[in-house]
Regions:
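Active-site-proximal helices and loops of the catalytic beta/alpha 8
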Residues: 112, 116, 189-289, 303-306, ...
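Substrate-binding/active-site clefts of carbohydrate-active enzymes
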Residues: 20-28, 33-198, 213-231, 236-238, ...
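Second-shell loop/turn segments in exported
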Residues: 177, 300-301
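Hydrophobic h-region of N-terminal signal peptides that target proteins for export
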Residues: 9-17
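Short acidic/histidine-rich active-site segments
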Residues: 325-328
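Sec-dependent signal peptide recognition
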Residues: 2-9
């Protein structure tokens, strides 16, 4: 049996190693809070601060719903055992046990298998900064059950003090001491074993700016798969430097710019474009998003479905790996945590306008390999923004019923371009100009 076991292990390692950052560049990620996306039985009314019953089998049952929008990767909640009530998964108690609220180990393996059968890659959320809220009773945590595994007790109060950010507690959570060689080696061994054992395709890493950068070099090497790190900060230079230590980071500077542009002025986006060009080591791998579980939903901040649709389509066509937060396709509008973590059951409507637009935009992404096309900004003012990627002209608005004439482009005279989102909407280059008439939704023109 040993030779067979060895062959299987080698095959699994080859499978995992195939998920390179270059391949991830072509993927589009649907973010799931495992406890809130789909359940297999009616567990009653959902208390947003407690477990509500979502599980791995529920996700399996709804993979066609995800696939129908065109997503080919999912990001799920941390899978390890947590303190009771920590439905989100960020409060570790046992590094080596799976969270039983989400299902058994067989259920988790079944999810991975079902996703791969449908060519959906799985990204698992992981935490290496902190453990659950146990004060100083470290005996409740395994294997980090001693005070020597943690930094001395202090709270982060000054986010401009990097030493404090890395060595003190986020929201009172015990802060792991990566300077302890055993702690670092344990975390690195764990992530390597986890990925190999379950055929995980990528990882999302929580709270990276609260951990020394040298640690991420080691963790990245041990993981061996694509990583996206969360540096919750709007400063481009600050966030971009973490991409020197991980494959990718969530593009929070762009996230804030998207809100200020689609709910304000596109001059903000124009400024971001010129300011960001040389900042990220590899902007094509950064994660582009409009919403997530840590912030109020877009429609809570800016209650306009047209603007939201414009922002979402922009995020799918802009450079980077798109990440879309579950429930957005149903126009969820929750406020601050936990109200932005609504259950999705009974709302799997495949007929919403955004569900259909997501499907069409994803089809275009794949047809033209949009990730390989350079971005050229073509027009920007307060209410209109346009860029091209190859033969695609993407036009966006943050208002209603406007007309613009684009003269800075590379399409030849007489070229016909048609909007892939709505049939019959075509324009042609005339006199070197392209006349665009916008409603309240984006227009994605493709050369015919």
């Amino acid at each position: 049996m040993r030779p067979i076991t060895l062959i299987i292990a080698l095959l699994l390692s080859v499978y995992v190693s195939c998920r390179t950052k270059e391949e991830w560049k072509s993927r589009s990620i649907y973010q799931i809070l495992t406890d809130r996306f789909a359940r297999t039985s009616d567990t009653g009314t959902c208390n947003y601060s407690q477990y509500c019953g979502g599980n791995y089998q529920g996700i399996i049952n709804k993979l066609d719903y995800i696939k129908g929008m065109g997503f080919d990767a999912i990001w799920i909640s941390p899978i390890v055992e947590n303190t009771e009530g920590s439905y989100h998964g960020y409060h570790l108690t046992n590094l080596y046990n799976l969270n039983p609220h989400f299902g058994s180990e067989d259920d988790f393996k079944a999810l991975i298998s079902a996703c791969h059968e449908k060519d959906i890659w799985v990204m698992v959320d992981v935490v290496a900064n902190h453990v659950g809220p146990v004060g100083t009773d470290y005996s409740r945590i395994y294997p980090f059950n001693s005070a020597e595994h943690y930094h001395d007790y202090c709270d982060i109060n000054n986010w401009s003090n990097q030493d404090e950010v890395e060595n003190c507690r986020l929201s009172g959570l015990p802060d792991l001491k990566q300077e302890n060689d055993w702690v670092t080696q344990t975390l690195c061994n764990w992530i390597s074993d986890l990925i190999t054992k379950y055929n995980i395709d990528g990882i999302r890493i929580d709270t990276i700016m609260e951990v020394p950068k040298w640690f991420w070099d080691k963790f990245r090497a041990s993981a061996g798969v694509f990583q996206i790190g969360e540096a919750f900060n709007g400063d481009i230079g600050y966030v971009a430097d973490y991409q020197n230590h991980l494959d990718s980071v969530f593009n929070y500077p762009l996230y804030y710019t998207i809100e200020s542009s689609f709910c304000g002025s596109f001059y903000n986006l124009e400024g971001y474009w010129f300011n960001s060009r040389s900042r990220y080591p590899a902007p094509e791998y950064t994660a582009t998003f409009v919403e997530n579980h840590d912030n109020r939903r877009f429609l809570n901040r800016c209650n306009d479905r047209g603007k939201f649709t414009n922002a979402v389509v922009f995020s799918l066509l802009w450079e980077g790996v798109p990440v879309f937060y579950y429930g957005g396709e149903q126009y969820y509008s929750g406020g601050d945590d936990p109200n932005n973590r609504e259950p999705l059951w009974d709302n799997y409507n495949t007929g919403t306008e955004l569900y259909k637009i997501l499907a069409k935009t994803h089809a275009l992404r794949k047809k033209v390999s949009i990730w390989n096309q350079p971005i050229v900004q073509r027009y920007a003012d307060n209410n209109f923004y346009a860029f091209t990627r190859g033969d695609v002209l993407a036009c966006f608005t943050n208002t209603y019923s406007l007309s613009r004439t684009i003269t800075y482009h590379e399409f030849s005279e007489g070229t016909k371009l048609c909007n892939i989102l709505y049939d019959g909407d075509c324009v042609s280059v005339s006199g070197g100009s392209i006349n665009i008439n916008m409603g309240d939704y984006p227009k994605v023109y493709v050369k015919q």
